[in-house]
UniProtKB/Swiss-Prot annotation:
Keywords: DNA-directed RNA polymerase, Nucleotidyltransferase, Transcription, Transferase. Belongs to the RNA polymerase beta chain family. GO terms for biological process: DNA-templated transcription. DNA-dependent RNA polymerase catalyzes the transcription of DNA into RNA using the four ribonucleoside triphosphates as substrates. The keyword rRNA-binding does not apply. Its EC number is 2.7.7.6. This is DNA-directed RNA polymerase subunit beta. PROSITE patterns: RNA_POL_BETA. GO terms for cellular component: DNA-directed RNA polymerase complex. The gene is rpoB. InterPro entries: DNA-dir_RNA_pol_su2, DNA-dir_RNAP_su2_dom, DNA-dir_RNAP_su2_hyb_sf, RNA_pol_bsu_bac, RNA_pol_bsu_CS, RNA_pol_bsu_protrusion, RNA_pol_Rpb2_3, RNA_pol_Rpb2_7. Disulfide bonds: none annotated.
């Protein structure tokens, strides 16, 4: 059903949306795992509480002191996110534990609250703030806990991976070895003896005994070989089988026969069977194998089932080895985990957890693995991979650090002498410093990509293979980097970086999430006997045995969702079967389920080559947020969901009216509550882009829960928007768009279409040293009066426009102390050198930066009595106090007026002093009581709100105020920090990189005058010219479909834009326009007679303001719909128009494809890249200039550039480039002398790289010389 009154986008494809609550939150991977790490519930698999409870209770060696854990407490961060970023601090929560210490000798029982350390706190966006910088812990692939059988270099191996403890590896070569952590080797017999096994137990496990009755004078003998083959009963208790079935089989005996004795492990033949028959023995014990296994290794183990050590050494080493094994498999040190235990039981077909038999079962399984060539376990399968997300990684690190804390506690307990020793029983720096170092140095802790909202979400959903499974970049082959069938709908096959990390850094699929067991799961519709029942999340362990069909296999009817046809191609693992709909188990949800968040924003994805889709998803993350961006005309339907999940816009938390609204805050009032929302204004990100929010509501508007009340510069109407819709033509224009070059119209610059704001932060630090204090002075700025008006106390004012090399902070550094003569002092005073003990070291604006000062943060730390005290800036503390106090008194006065109205309406008199808002005691309000039960009930509601909400917040504020000063983390020598932010506006320029959503990237080669751009017969100019040769070879045909569809829709929109005054148009014409549009797009005839004129006007305004469509990926999109729209409007079939040259006015011979395309400006700007080199460093070996801006390198003349010069025949220019301008040392020196003397002559010699080549040839024993 189409909602005619309210819609964001017209939908071309019919898509079944499931309920919003089932859609996984895109940041759930980070936020959910971190919350479970902090969870106080013991059920959480890796919470702090579970880690701590493993080590308690603690008992000292002499059993005199006993420590018991009572509870833990985690307090909220004392600083705000904004404050920590300004002050370059850490955002963290404080962790306390409550313990009871029992000292038995002294009858002491002490209950203590102990500070354990600081735990880094996560923001709403899923990142951490470390040293004032947004950082993120990306997830990591690792091998799942359990048992694996595999072959490596033609060796059969078995490995056991526990959660805690050493990895056990069974290797079968000439000897049967067991390896611990790939270091310590044991033979299997030593391993089994140390675990407590003996011969009898070992053979009772692998063999079993049966009684066999021997009947003399018969041609048959009765044995039990295999219960499944050739058996029949003669007597009640015996099973018969012919002698042929036991020839060559292994058995042993327990009873000795008369005269002849049978040795163990004899092979029976017919003669020996006859020997048995000749003796009068009726019952005989035989040992048979339980199952068929490799007997050679079993006999080897049996024969060598003694330690191969001398008897003298055995007394010393045996006890050591046994103790080693006991400690190795101690419960607290060796733990399989719940997942590992399940995998082992399932693989070995065990029902009970019997520690005595588990290793014997493993040996039996290994022998089967060798004998029958059982299939190897695949480590690339997601069933065998765990995801270590940020909560799990922090839990592992916290466990490692807390072991050190326990060692410290044990040391204190064992050296306990006085009661005061218990005060310092825990060293809190172990956890605080350990976690801080982990975030600063670990390769999984990365600088958050905040280029735009999409980049931030994608970075949150990244998964790394590096170092997780022991993988290094250099040694990774194609098998590790390649996609696997288990990745389907769980890991995106497209989204991965280009270069040496390809395939090693992956991204979660759009509808996948990490479950509580740390496996990737995705959402499916459940089908049982052809009926679609509901929705569930399943990981690869469960869905590998199911038949799964495509999302297009169902259709909606009035009776619900049903299958389209009786038979389908169903997928099971990596095979496809033709199955009836009754046998289908699971159905996919939608086409975006396969791909990642970035790839889901590419329209017509199925029409593009996979390599270009990869580039498209990577390019979108590099797009710069513009000042005024646009929503794409053609979208995929996911723009709104990604925009809402990015937290870049603000949603209302309650139903109510807007009480106040401006560009800095929005206040919403409800019947019982008032909430204030503060907007982010010109906030700097890690990539120097901005986040700027602006209000979408006005005073008096009614909002509901979930309504968008504030948008940002990267989102529009809630949808993510990163670029602009431009009118494009695929044609050649005087050779300027050669290869991937892009031509732009100057009208784009005039309209400021691709303008972006970048914020640069500059910091200067004032320190105290032996010579004195570093100071800030106005003298660095010079004596110009205009400049002095811009400066205040040595620092430039907010709002001033600055250029490169301008001084913004006048920093002065003290000189070494020395005595000046009276004449020197007089000389400096006369020439007004007041600061003659200092020299200047000002902070200046770097090259290529000019902009406006938008913020100056000055943090002072005062000096007193030769000691430096870290004090907070008084104004900053006042600011925070003021905000919280204002909120407290606003809400308090609101409820106070409610109480006054209640008392006044019910004519209840009370003294004015009790409820005077200027001088009020809160306790007086709590004392107010009424005899009327109804009034008293309402009063109690207001009292509870005041006590629970307001007083709690007041207490939290007091706690924060106390802890503000405690956690400043500066060096001892720092006395002042000054941070200045400059906002720089950057226009599009020649050399900037631009891209579409289909991987069609290029560099702006020229910006053409508006008058010279091609135009159509109506005089409409082209904004963008692309090379048509860039489409067929790249196979990204999706951009053409976008151009045709967006071009036809924009033409419809142009009809509406011409109607400026809606009062002049009749309602009949409005209805006619709406009917035509719905007929074109939806192919439906709508009856507008059921709507009144006001509703028709509302629909008409919606279409006029926004006529955007969405085409869902991988759906059966009918291209004929686009053709129908084009025909209805009256354009050529392929959107081909006749264009005219803007310079000559002549028309082009051929028709040109013209339409609209969504284009973005990428964060590869020419201003940041181009620089000049006059002098610089040279390479030691080749003596050529170094490369790169950071090395002050030169421009490299590569092989293709040489070809270009050769093609033009520029021999002398080429000679210069390859000799004196490169690595001809003698030629360089001579040219420098000639330039000084004014001689226009350049003689080149032999380049140094040629000398290197000569030495390399000579090293190969070739006698070669330069003639």
């Amino acid at each position: 059903m189409i909602n005619y009154l309210k819609f964001n986008r017209f939908c071309f494809s019919k898509k079944k949306f499931f309920h919003k609550c089932n859609l996984p939150y895109l940041l759930h991977n980070q936020i959910g795992s971190y919350n479970s790490f902090l969870s106080s519930k013991y059920n959480s698999l890796f919470s702090i509480k579970k880690v701590l409870k493993q080590y308690f209770p603690l008992i000292c060696n002499n059993k005199n002191i006993f420590i018991k854990l009572k509870k833990i407490e985690l307090l909220e961060p004392c600083n705000t996110e904004k404050y920590t970023k300004i002050r370059n601090l850490h955002l963290f929560s404080t962790l306390y534990m409550y313990i009871s210490i029992y000292v038995i000798n002294k009858n002491l029982n002490v209950y203590k609250k102990i500070f354990l350390g600081n735990i880094p706190s996560m923001t709403k966006k899923g990142n951490f703030i470390i040293n004032g910088i947004d950082r993120i812990l990306i997830s990591q692939f690792t091998k799942s806990y359990g048992i694996y059988f595999y072959t490596e270099k033609k060796k059969k191996k078995c490995i056991i991976i526990p959660l805690k403890g050493s990895w056990l590896e069974f290797i079968i070569t000439n000897n049967f070895l067991i390896v611990f952590d790939k270091k310590i080797n044991f033979e299997i017999n030593v391993f089994l003896i140390c675990l407590g096994y003996n011969k009898k137990y070992f053979f009772n496990f692998f063999f079993f005994k049966i009684k066999i009755k021997i009947i003399r004078g018969k041609k048959r003998i009765f044995f039990l070989l295999n219960k499944k083959k050739y058996f029949y009963k003669i007597y009640n208790k015996y099973i018969c089988i012919s002698i042929k079935k036991i020839l060559g089989k292994l058995f042993g005996k327990n009873y000795f026969l008369k005269k002849n004795t049978f040795l163990k492990f004899n092979i029976i033949d017919i003669n020996k069977v006859n020997l048995i028959l000749n003796y009068p023995i009726y019952f005989f014990f035989i040992i048979f194998l339980k199952k068929i296994i490799n007997l050679n290794y079993l006999i080897y183990i049996y024969k060598n089932f003694k330690l191969k050590i001398n008897k003298e050494l055995l007394q010393y080493k045996k006890g050591y080895i046994i103790n080693f094994f006991r400690n190795l498999f101690y419960k607290k040190k060796y733990f399989y985990s719940l997942i590992g235990a399940k995998r082992i039981f399932k693989r070995l077909f065990l029902k009970k957890n019997n520690k005595l038999t588990i290793y014997l079962e493993i040996i039996k399984k290994i022998l089967k693995f060798i004998k029958f060539n059982i299939q190897n376990d695949n480590f690339d399968n997601l069933e065998n991979k765990l995801i270590l997300n940020c909560g799990k990684l922090l839990s592992i690190k916290f466990d490692f650090l807390f072991k050190k804390v326990i060692k410290f506690i044990n040391y204190k307990m064992n050296n306990f002498k006085k009661y005061k020793d218990l005060d310092f029983i825990v060293n809190s720096d172990i956890i605080t410093i350990g976690l801080k170092d982990y975030f600063c140095n670990n390769e999984l802790s990365q600088f958050l990509d905040q280029n735009n909202p999409l980049a931030e979400i994608s970075h949150n959903r990244k998964i790394s293979l590096i170092s997780g499974i022991g993988i290094e970049k250099e040694n990774c082959g194609f098998d590790i980097r390649d996609i696997h069938y288990s990745h389907y709908c769980k890991v995106c096959p497209i989204d991965t970086p280009e270069g040496h990390n390809i395939g090693l850094i992956n991204s979660l699929a759009y509808l996948s999430k990490v479950n509580k067991y740390n496996f990737i799961s995705t959402i499916y519709k459940i089908s049982i006997l052809g009926k679609i029942l509901g929705i569930t999340f399943l990981d690869n362990k469960f869905d590998k045995h199911k038949f799964i069909v495509n999302f297009n296999s169902t259709i909606e009817t009035i009776y619900g969702e049903i299958f389209r046809s009786p038979y389908f191609e169903a997928r099971k693992t990596n095979y496809y079967y033709y199955k009836k709909f009754l046998n289908i188990d699971l159905i996919e949800i939608c086409g975006d389920q396969i791909i990642s968040v970035g790839a889901s924003l590419i329209p017509f994805l199925s029409h593009n080559d996979a390599n270009r889709c990869l580039m498209g998803s990577n390019m979108q993350r590099q797009a710069v947020p513009l000042i005024d961006s646009e929503n794409p005309i053609v979208g995929t339907g996911n723009e709104l969901e990604i925009g809402l999940n990015s937290n870049y816009n603000i949603l209302s938390d309650l139903n109510g009216y807007v009480l106040y609204s401006d560009n800095y805050k929005i206040i919403i009032k409800n019947n019982n509550f008032i909430k204030t929302y503060f907007l982010e204004k010109y906030t700097r990100t890690n990539q120097n882009t901005i986040l700027n929010q602006y209000t979408k509501v006005l005073k008096g508007d009614f909002v509901k829960v979930g309504n968008i009340i504030a948008d940002s510069n990267s989102t529009k109407n809630g949808e993510i928007s990163l670029g602009k819709n431009l009118r494009v033509a695929f044609m050649s224009w005087y050779g300027y768009n050669f290869e991937d070059s892009i031509l732009l119209s100057s009208s784009i610059l005039n309209k400021n279409n691709f303008n972006s704001i970048h914020i640069y932060e500059f910091i200067t630090v004032l320190k105290y040293n032996e010579n004195g204090f570093e100071i800030v002075s106005n003298e660095c700025f010079g004596s110009n009066e205009k400049i002095k008006n811009k400066v205040k106390n040595g620092i430039i004012k907010i709002g001033e426009f600055v250029f490169s090399k301008d001084v913004i902070v006048g920093k002065m550094i003290p000189k070494k102390k020395r005595k000046f003569s009276p004449e020197e002092k007089l000389f400096k005073i006369v020439f007004s050198e007041s600061n003659f003990n200092y020299y200047e070291q000002p902070l200046t604006v770097p090259k290529n930066i000019k902009g406006t000062i938008i913020a100056v943060n000055d943090f002072k730390i005062f000096y007193f009595k030769n000691k430096i005290f870290k004090l907070l800036k008084f104004e900053q503390l006042n600011y925070t106090c003021k905000n919280i106090n204002n909120f407290f008194y606003e809400t308090f006065n609101y409820y106070l007026t409610k109480i006054k109205k209640l008392l006044f309406n019910n004519k209840i008199t009370i003294k004015k002093k009790r409820i005077n808002s200027y001088n009020i005691n809160i306790n007086n309000i709590f004392k107010i009581k009424c005899f009327n039960k109804k009034i008293n009930f309402k009063l109690n509601i207001f009292k509870n709100i005041i006590s629970n909400e307001l007083l709690k917040k007041k207490n939290i504020f007091v706690y924060k105020k106390i802890n503000f000063i405690k956690h400043d983390d500066f060096e001892n020598s720092i006395i002042r920090i000054i941070k200045i932010k400059i906002a720089v506006k950057k226009q599009i320029a020649i050399g900037d990189k631009m891209s579409g959503r289909h991987g069609n990237k290029g560099v702006v080669s020229n910006i053409i005058d508006y008058e010279n751009m091609p135009y159509d017969k109506f005089g409409n100019k082209i904004d963008l010219i692309l090379n048509p040769l860039g489409v067929p070879s790249r196979m990204n045909v999706g951009q053409l479909l976008e151009v045709f569809l967006a071009g036809s829709l924009n033409l419809i929109k142009s009809f509406f834009l011409k109607i400026k005054n809606l009062n002049k148009i009749s309602y009949f014409k409005m209805k006619l326009f709406i009917k035509i549009i719905f007929k074109c797009i939806y192919d439906k005839n709508i009856n507008l007679n059921i709507f009144n004129n006001s509703l028709v006007l509302k629909i008409f305004k919606n279409i006029k303001n926004q006529l955007n469509v969405c085409v869902h990926n991988f759906y059966n999109f009918n291209v004929n719909k686009v053709n129908n729209i084009i025909k209805t409007i009256g354009i050529n079939k392929n959107c081909e128009l006749l264009l005219f040259d803007g310079i000559t006015g002549k028309r082009y011979l051929q028709l040109v494809n013209v339409g609209y395309i969504y284009f973005m400006k990428l964060n590869h700007l020419v201003i940041d890249k181009i620089y000049s080199r006059s002098i610089g460093p040279y390479s030691i070996v080749t003596q050529q200039p170094l490369g790169g801006k950071s090395n002050l390198g030169g421009q490299r003349l590569g092989e293709m550039e040489v070809w270009a010069l050769e093609a033009y025949g520029a021999a002398f220019l080429l000679k210069e480039m390859l000799t004196i301008k490169s690595d001809d040392i003698l030629g360089r020196i001579e040219l420098y002398k000639n330039i000084i003397k004014g001689i226009n002559d350049a003689n080149s010699g032999i380049p140094e790289s040629f000398q290197v080549l000569m030495k390399e040839i000579q090293s190969l024993c070739f006698d070669i010389k330069i003639l």
